[in-house]
A protein has these predicted regions:
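Secretory/organelle targeting and membrane-embedding segments
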Residues: 24-204, 208-549
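N-terminal amphipathic/hydrophobic targeting modules at extreme N-termini
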Residues: 11-15, 23-25
Length: 549
């Protein structure tokens, strides 16, 4: 049977103009019927030709923290993938900056090995060498003003040599303690001055502060030397195709948006579950915990996309305005609400895929008496016409049963009246599941008659999987985001008000949990779905978590 594929929809590297007002319209226009994936790729020139360069401005990409894990595992592989798909400009340079003494040739040798190690597919040596030829290194202490004097000299030289036209992109792949310091030092040297003829942008990784006051302080420090339009606060979850597709799914399909409200939706679940423990991040995690690490950014950003109103246009500011409205409308919690509507947990020893794993307190760099939560669950409400009375259940945790990130929208059950004289005693509600990772896709469960002389209703699924329709393109989740920063498209990045609104949701919970001490933590065995108290959170409302097995 022929399948319908919207032109340009599912490429994470789709070229975008600086004016993104037609973003979703471009995703869904000119639909065509093709018989299979091969025909789709043949008929869609996007798979064969690079864009015309308008959204690939010359760029000098400066990575602070170039020797770190993020650079190795995410940034370099993403840049390699962009180069492979012809989505980097010819005038492109990478300058790594870090405190480890090393020259450019040594750094190139290291990155050559990193590319080989981190790629799940055979490496194209031509692409690899093209990228390595544009790679340079500067050794220096981030806190030393002399580092920025040498950086200024090197930027001038590389800009002239490679024709990057003064467009500098600074990526903070460092510990959060350096964010404000680096920005201030760059500002002191005039290296973030933004003009019409060239761009200067900064990308900042999470965490954006560790509470509301620190987030405000960081935003203030950044705005002393930068305009808000120059700051790109990155959340790699928003780079995932299935998260981006929520907007298309909602606003490009006439059958879903009319029922996307309190009249038809019973509740929403957002789950980010990991089977991994804290690994080598024990020291960081002791200061953060599951709530700080995941909720103000990943989970609340997904919630905002699910719950936002349609923007007037798909201009970046219009989209970000609507997301901010959702966060602003989340019902604030008082201490009693926190006690009744949140659960904190910590994993103990257990089995993951048949393998014994240590309890959190036995992990490296973790306090043996730690009260840091590795699991967080909560019920949130949104005070709006669309969502009044619809609970949003959020949970995230480590060492859980299955690695899964998904959004579950459960619709209200149909009335039973039609089937009152049949053996049917209950109707299963329709459930829409948006799988963000792994097995990216969307499924919808609905009732169907079981064959036979009696009227019996069973549940069946309509299921869409990205890989089945569009193949398995290499992606780290960073490709789209890096491409968008270079193009000046801030749609998928957090604005300062959204960051602070996220912390305003989390701060009251943190304060109550900290005041409770050991009484706040509920323990769970590794390999389960968290503490029983998380199940009770939904059970008291007559609902259940949707768990994979």
């Amino acid at each position: 049977m022929a399948k319908r594929f919207p032109v340009e929809q599912f490429s994470s590297l789709t070229p975008r103009a600086n004016d993104t007002s037609g973003k979703v319209r471009e995703l869904v226009k000119n639909s065509q019927i093709v018989s299979n994936q091969a025909d789709y790729q043949k008929e869609n020139a996007l798979f064969q030709q690079p864009d015309n360069g308008q959204t690939r401005p010359p760029t000098l990409f400066v990575v602070f923290g170039a020797q770190g894990d993020l650079t190795k595992r995410k940034l370099i592989p993403a840049l390699y993938n962009l180069a492979s798909s012809h989505h980097l400009p010819q005038e492109f340079v990478i300058l790594g900056v870090d405190g480890i003494p090393m020259d450019t040739e040594e750094f190139r040798g290291k990155i050559r090995l990193d590319i080989q190690e981190m790629s799940p597919r055979p490496i194209d040596s031509t692409i690899k060498e093209w990228l390595l030829d544009r790679l340079y290194y500067l050794s220096g202490d981030f806190r030393n003003p002399q580092t920025y004097e040498r950086l200024q000299t090197m930027l001038t030289e590389l800009n002239a040599r490679h024709g990057t036209q003064g467009n500098y992109l600074y990526y903070m792949a460092t510990a959060p303690t350096f964010f404000a310091e680096i920005a201030q030092q760059l500002g002191a040297k005039g290296l973030v001055e933004h003009r019409k003829e060239f761009s200067r942008r900064i990308v900042i990784e999470k965490p954006f502060g560790h509470d509301l006051p620190s987030a405000r302080s960081l935003n203030q420090s950044l705005r002393e030397v930068l305009e808000e339009s120059q700051i790109y606060r990155i959340d790699h979850y928003l780079g995932k195709e299935t998260v981006q597709n929520i907007l298309v799914f909602r606003f490009a399909n006439g059958i879903f948006e009319p029922v996307w409200n309190r009249q038809y939706i019973d509740h929403v679940q957002i789950t980010v579950a990991e089977t991994l423990g804290v690994e080598h991040r024990g020291a960081y995690y002791e200061k953060a915990g599951a709530l700080r690490d995941m909720v103000p950014n990943h989970l609340l950003q997904i919630l905002a996309i699910v719950a936002m109103e349609p923007p007037n246009t798909f201009d970046p500011e219009a989209v970000r305005n609507e997301k901010a409205k959702v966060l602003r409308a989340i019902q604030p919690m008082n201490p009693v609400d926190v006690l009744q509507s949140t659960v904190a947990g910590q994993y103990e020893a257990g089995l993951i895929s048949g393998r014994s794993v240590l309890p959190y307190r036995a992990e490296m760099h973790v306090d043996p008496t730690s009260l840091t939560e590795t699991f967080a669950a909560m019920t949130l409400g949104i005070e709006s016409w669309r969502w009044e009375g619809v609970p949003f259940y959020l949970r995230t945790g480590k060492r859980l049963n299955t690695r899964s990130t998904e959004v579950v929208i459960q619709f209200k059950s149909a009335p039973l009246m039609l089937f009152r004289k049949t053996p049917v005693d209950r109707l299963t509600p329709n459930v829409l599941t948006i799988r963000i990772q792994p097995d990216e896709g969307i499924s919808l469960s609905f009732g169907a008659k079981i064959p036979g002389p009696k009227v019996q209703v069973g549940t069946v699924d309509m299921d869409f999987q990205y890989t089945e329709y569009f193949g398995d393109a290499p992606s780290t989740g960073y490709e789209t985001l890096l491409h968008d920063v270079m193009a000046g498209d801030a749609t998928l990045f957090q604005r300062s008000d959204s960051v602070e609104l996220g912390w305003s949701v989390v701060d009251p919970i943190l304060k109550v949990w900290e005041s409770l001490g050991s009484h706040a933590i509920h323990f769970y065995n590794a390999g389960t779905w968290g503490p029983p108290e998380a199940d009770a959170l939904l059970a008291k409302d007559g609902r259940m978590w949707r768990n994979h097995t």
